[in-house]
């Protein structure tokens, strides 16, 4: 037993003597596919000395001969390099450009009769087919890794959602907030490498919008996109379901080419107008109750499966006065929590209900406001002026009656005046005739007082 110990010691010494250089601990370095990696090798002497880099098959990659860089017959011949400026400092790095998954290997640096081993693991992370996805579609991220590795992956979306997995990660029903830079971290052997992937979610800025208008006002519908593409081509259509209609109908169809919009077909009632450039913009000449309702604009992009959607709603308000009834009405899709009110200006609401129509009987004169509000915030307002009761529609008849009475009284008055005047003239004429007769008979005693001087007693 004791005689075997010296032999084993001798065998170990012989093996160590046969080794060309001592091997230090192996380092692990993670790299990204397509990137550049730098593997370090440091000598104890701060000067340029001879070194060699080899792969696990002992095939030389590169080394030096004096101040010259020499390369071996490895597959990295055209992608391998070193930093000559660091040689005088005792640093002899191996630089590998445009990394590939198959570059994963153990690389050996021989310097000063020592060996430094570096294990390089190259990973790649790619998105499925395209990084431009329609809203609602699924995103799949696939990790490429070297054989024998067992990495874990964790990704964080722009909206802060964390997704964990192995070599495949899937995210369903992408939302607009998922558009942006995704940060993914790959962990292997307590080392990590970070990937950044830009994902563009193709969508409208708003999933739905609502427009509030008074009857007769012009309506503007806008459909801005949440992304920018230099050459955007596709086609679209707006379908509209009026509140009073039994079915929806197509209001307009259009083409989109290089951000230029051209109308293919438009209905005559209503006759929409469409802008010729992005963002998509539609104009309805007048907001009328028969147009109130909901629409759905679809946009199909070239080379993309599926369509973009945006819902748009139109609410129309009308305030009217008919005889002694003041009415406020709204048409279109409204929330049950919305409040419809009628109030006299600068006064409390006369009536306020969660309904689509309210009214006031025998309203006071003044400016009345019809208000549609949500939790105190006014969404739509229409004003109507109520005139005093004497200015009601019966005014012309009253004036006719009053005028007739006044005319009759004037006629009667004039008749009486002319009758009295005529009678007065007749009596005066009779008196003058009597005077002339008396004078002719020389009976001056019967004359008026002014003729008494010429009268003689009978």
From Swiss-Prot:
Signal peptide interval: 1-25
Effect of residue 445 to A: Loss of homodimerization
Short name of one Pfam family: C2-set
Effect of residue 68 to I: Abrogates the interaction with MHCII and T cell activation
UniProt PTM comment: Palmitoylation and association with LCK contribute to the enrichment of CD4 in lipid rafts. Phosphorylated by PKC; phosphorylation at Ser-433 plays an important role for CD4 internalization.
Keyword Cell inner membrane: no
Tissue spec. comment: Highly expressed in T-helper cells. The presence of CD4 is a hallmark of T-helper cells which are specialized in the activation and growth of cytotoxic T-cells, regulation of B cells, or activation of phagocytes. CD4 is also present in other immune cells such as macrophages, dendritic cells or NK cells.
Phenotype upon changing residue 265 to W: In OKT4-negative populations
Effect of residue 433 to A: About 75% loss of internalization
Topological domains, Extracellular: 26-396
TM regions (residue ranges): 397-418
One GO CC term, this protein: T cell receptor complex
Result when mutating residue 85 to R: Increases the affinity for MHCII
Localization annotation: Cell membrane
Modified residues (Phosphoserine): 433, 440, 456
Result of altering residue 65 to Y: Increases the affinity for MHCII
Glycosylation sites: 296, 325
Domain notes: The Ig-like V-type domain mediates the interaction with MHCII.
Assembly and oligomerization: Forms disulfide-linked homodimers at the cell surface. Interacts with LCK. Interacts with PTK2/FAK1. Binds to P4HB/PDI. Interacts with IL16; this interaction induces a CD4-dependent signaling in lymphocytes. Interacts (via Ig-like V-type domain) with MHCII alpha chain (via alpha-2 domain) and beta chain (via beta-2 domain); this interaction increases the affinity of TCR for peptide-MHCII. CD4 oligomerization via Ig-like C2-type 2 and 3 domains appears to be required for stable binding to MHCII and adhesion between T cells and APCs. Interacts with Aedes aegypti long form salivary protein D7L2.
Protein name: T-cell surface glycoprotein CD4
Organism: Homo sapiens
Chain's gene name: CD4
């Amino acid at each position: 037993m004791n005689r075997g110990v010296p032999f084993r010691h001798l065998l170990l010494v012989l093996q160590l003597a046969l080794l060309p250089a001592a091997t230090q601990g192996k380092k692990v370095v993670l790299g990204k596919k397509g990137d550049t990696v730098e593997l370090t090798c440091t000598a104890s002497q701060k000067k340029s000395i001879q070194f060699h880099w080899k792969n696990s098959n002992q095939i030389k990659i590169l080394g030096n001969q004096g101040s010259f860089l020499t390369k071996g017959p490895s597959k990295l011949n055209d992608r391998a390099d070193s930093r000559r400026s660091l040689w005088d400092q005792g640093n002899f790095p191996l630089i590998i450009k445009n990394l590939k998954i198959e570059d994963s290997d153990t690389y050996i640096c021989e310097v000063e009769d020592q060996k430094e081993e570096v294990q390089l693991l190259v990973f790649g992370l790619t998105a499925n087919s395209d990084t431009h996805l329609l809203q609602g579609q699924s995103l799949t991220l696939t990790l490429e890794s070297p054989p024998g590795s067992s990495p874990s992956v964790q990704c964080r979306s722009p909206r802060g959602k964390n997704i964990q997995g192995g070599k495949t990660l899937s995210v369903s029903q992408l939302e607009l907030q998922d558009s942006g830079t995704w940060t993914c971290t790959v962990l292997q052997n307590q080392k990590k490498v970070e990937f950044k992937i830009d994902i563009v979610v193709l969508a409208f800025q708003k999933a739905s919008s609502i427009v509030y208008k008074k009857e007769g006002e012009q309506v503007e519908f806008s459909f801005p996109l949440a992304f920018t593409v230099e050459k955007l081509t596709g086609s679209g259509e707006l379908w509209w379901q009026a509140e009073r209609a039994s079915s929806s109908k197509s209001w307009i169809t259009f083409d989109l080419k290089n951000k230029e919009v051209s109308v293919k077909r438009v209905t005559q009632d209503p006759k929409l107008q469409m802008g010729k450039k992005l963002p998509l913009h539609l104009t309805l000449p007048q907001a009328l109750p028969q147009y109130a309702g909901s629409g759905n604009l679809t946009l199909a992009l070239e080379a993309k499966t599926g369509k973009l959607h945006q819902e748009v709603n139109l609410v129309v308000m009308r305030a009217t006065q008919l005889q002694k009834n003041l009415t406020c009405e709204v048409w279109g899709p409204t929330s049950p929590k919305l409040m419809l009110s009628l109030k006299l200006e600068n006064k409390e609401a006369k009536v306020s209900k969660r309904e689509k129509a309210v009214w006031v009987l025998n309203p006071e004169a003044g400016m009345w406001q019809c208000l549609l509000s949500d939790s105190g915030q006014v969404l739509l307002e229409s004003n109507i002026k109520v005139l005093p009761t004497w200015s009601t529609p019966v005014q012309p008849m009253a004036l006719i009656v009053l005028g007739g009475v006044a005319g009759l009284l004037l006629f009667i008055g004039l008749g009486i005046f002319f009758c009295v005047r005529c009678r007065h003239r007749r009596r005066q004429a009779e008196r003058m005739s009597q005077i002339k007769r008396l004078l002719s008979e020389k009976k001056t005693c019967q004359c008026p007082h002014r003729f008494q001087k010429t009268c003689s007693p009978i």
